[in-house]
Amino acid sequence: HYYKVAAVRDISIAVEDGKIVTLIGSNGAGKTTTLRAVSGLKHPTTGEIRFSGERIDKLPSHKINALGIAMVPEGRRVFPQMTVIENLLTGAYLRKDKDDIQKDLEEVVFKHFPRLKERTKQAAGTLSGGEQQMLAMGRALMSAPKLLLLDEPSLGLSPIMCGQIAAIIRNIHAEGRTVVLVEQNARLALALAQHAYVIETGDIVLSGPAEELRENDEVKKAYLGG
């Protein structure tokens, strides 16, 4: 709930290990609220959320992050006055395996985002929108997550940059990470995901394999321009 308004109601979502699951729907449908609930930024008033069998809906966000869930928020939310490397290291703040942080920086983050390696000493606020999106994703990966929550990663990006971000999401998934993707660009989301949920005004109205939803007449009409 936000104040007395129910943002989502009776939502039941299952995310299989190693899959990309997408939530699509119009603005205000409840997609971001769902991600915020999973990450601990918003606590549900009823129901429960489980991760790897453990109930997490009462936990604070830093404990949820420590369990292996990282969120890339809508709008990137990088720290503009801090350098690229400083932003990335904030993602590793809660890690106990300090010896592996430098290794992950080189073998995970800079492998997926070589552009960030060229800009480690640059202030994050001077990066382009696409580079800031890469930085936000890299920061999340520095927490070594099992589950990556992506909120509108293509928002405000050029078509070319959208394609690059999509390719990076595929590569991250190919390494075995589970991804939940919230995306208004339904065409992109359904191309990336294996399973999809359509949310409207806080309710799930459709769900199924992404390839089936791509061919669904209602989905085509409402979200795919035809």
Whereabouts are the PLM-identified features?
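Conserved ABC ATPase signature
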Residues: 123-127, 131
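ABC ATPase C-loop
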Residues: 140-141
